[in-house]
Amino acid sequence: MADLTKLVDELSALTVLEAAELSKLLEEKWGVSAAAPVAVAAAPAAGAAAAPAEEQTEFTVVLAKAGDKKINVIKEIRGITGLGLKEAKDLVEGAPKTVKEGVNKDEAEKIKKLLEDNGASVEVK
C-alpha cells in the first residue's frame, strides 16, 4: 500500500508536459490510444440524434403570453394543472412558462385550444 501512495505522490509532482509524455509512453507500451474511447462514445450520440426523427409521442404545453383575458386564462390554468389561485396567477404572469409536460398529442391540442379560446398564446413542443 505504501508503494501505491508513493507512486501517487510522484505522479502528482509531474508537470503537465511530463504527464503528457508519460501518457504517450504508456500508450505505446500497452498498445492503446487515449483517443479511442472518445470515438466510441460519439457513435451512440449520433444514433440518439436520429431517434427524434420518429414521431413525437409526448408534448409540452407552454403558455407564451396570457393575452387580454388574464383572469379567464388563470381559471383555465387552475383547471388544467390543479394549481391554487396564487400559483396559477404566478404562472400566467410569469409567461412564458410550462403549463403541462409529457402529455399526448390530443391532450396537448385540447389544452392549447382551451387557452387560446381565452386569449392566450400557447406553444406545443
Swiss-Prot record:
**Keyword Nucleus assigned:** no
Which source organism? Gluconacetobacter diazotrophicus (strain ATCC 49037 / DSM 5601 / CCUG 37298 / CIP 103539 / LMG 7603 / PAl5)
**Entry GO CC:** cytosolic large ribosomal subunit
Q: Which UniProt keywords apply?
A: Ribonucleoprotein, Ribosomal protein
| Protein name per Swiss-Prot or TrEMBL | Large ribosomal subunit protein bL12
Q: Which GO terms describe its molecular function?
A: mRNA binding; structural constituent of ribosome
Its quaternary structure? Homodimer. Part of the ribosomal stalk of the 50S ribosomal subunit. Forms a multimeric L10(L12)X complex, where L10 forms an elongated spine to which 2 to 4 L12 dimers bind in a sequential fashion. Binds GTP-bound translation factors.
Which CDD domains does this chain map to? Ribosomal_L7_L12
What function does this protein fulfil? Answer: Forms part of the ribosomal stalk which helps the ribosome interact with GTP-bound translation factors. Is thus essential for accurate translation.
